[in-house]
Amino acid sequence: MPSQQSLPDFVQAMDAAGFLVRITDEIRVDQIPVTLEANPTKAVLIEKIKDCEFSVLANAYSNQDMYAWAMECDRTQTGRKMVEKAKSRAKWEIVETAPCKEVILKGDDVDLTRLPLFLHHDRDGHAYTNDNLFISKHPDTGVYDWGIYRSMFRSKNEKSVDMTCTSHRQRIHAMAAAAKGQNLEVAMVIGGPILDKISALVGVPGDTDDFEVLGGFYGAPAKMVKCETIDVMVPANAELVLECELMATEGMSFDEGPYGEYTGMYGGGMKHNYRLKVKAMTYRKNPIYQHCTIGGMHPWYTDNMLQLPAIEADLYGALRLAGIDVMEVRSPAGGLSNIAYAKIRPLGAGDAKQALGLMLTCSKQGLPKVAMVFNDDVDIWDDQAVLAAMAFRYMPDRDTVLIKDCNTMTVDPKCAEPGVASKIGMDCTKPMGAGWNPDEFIKSAVTDLGEPPADLKPLTEDEIAREMEAFIGAEPRAWLDILKHFHGQPYKFIYGAFGSLRHKLGRMNDAPWYRYTLSDRPFAFEAKPAALSNFDPRHVGSGPA
């Protein structure tokens, strides 16, 4: 992808890639929610909004195929690619101006009703902007952070913002400002390409400049431009910027919410949160207002699923650092960011449990709540393969990791205390150790003998029987070996010949094949009937062969 795309260029690229639906008829703002809900798997560009100068783009980062496209990789590798890119840094560059300065409104001219405001979900507290990348500097260090936060309309120049998660850096900045008796200067950037959003969600230490990380994702310095009324820099490809004063000295004392969240429910109810004063609005002429789809009847196909690759990256990176041989991490869309799978190659019997502990606690998102770990023979991107491994490789009393009182998102309605949750990990790997027979977990692959040899010499049933007896007499044979040897002969002759020899054959105790050998008894080893037990599927003793 080109570095630092403008939003119009990004829209064109999505259209060319087949990810975009265009709505060319003019619609009212109140029709926007149902229009978006009717197109859950595509980005939607509504070109004309009645009585509004903005067009609307939404659902533009709503599924894992889009993330893979933006990261130029396979969807199974987005987490790994994010970890790799997050290691890079590039110092940002300042430019004098940018398209987001084509329209500048300050002071009394600020009017948020210029935006295409609408009630997204029935019980929302008010209209929200939610494709908001909040940008601020730490009051003590000057280090930049940006992150995505929901923000509710209050008046033409006021908003509320949800910062109830204690680990989020914008909240940390606000509290640091309040401790100094100051408010916090914040820029809200609305509209930008997927790569910018992915970069904003990467887990990095608090002393890391997020725009140096953005440059690492670009592979080139991010270009930044100064705001008009506050001492904050914003990316030069911003479409719309709201320059704000976050009233940190007032505390979290203003109503915000409820809001239809990524859970598909109204998590968190009405909250106490911060108030923002909007000091300036700047944007491009013929602007596109980007909205983040969230909740609704298809919560697994919304822009808030951007958390998925972020969680995958956090988990993949933590597992690698801990020495776990991790191959892939997946946060499935239907798990709404709260479920994650890892495919690993265990080197020791404790690797799976150690991996689960890391998966449940390492992400700055406070997610997932449920983690599962699988062997490398399980395709974690195939839901049926995942369920099959859970069904027969997971034993609840031995393979469960339970951790109480962990951080999570405050929108989880099941939490008795907001932001605090118990978490569970399930070890769905094959057991290791002397007490386990790995052969019992071999998958039952279908037989494919291929084409018979072209120079096959037809045999009678008696000839097959004589040759089969000699073949088994040379060394014990599995039935598959016998079928391969006689492949192309009439199957009735093969089975008939074997039946004529059956009284001369016994079975070896050599798992997993339990081969046939010449013997005067059914078990060609010292075998005594054993009590039925699920721990010994063979139901026989393990005496010498």
Tell me the role of every PLM-derived stretch:
Residues 1-275, 279-488, 492-494:
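Extended, highly charged
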Residues 483-544:
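Non-catalytic nucleic-acid substrate-recognition regions in nucleic-acid-modifying enzymes
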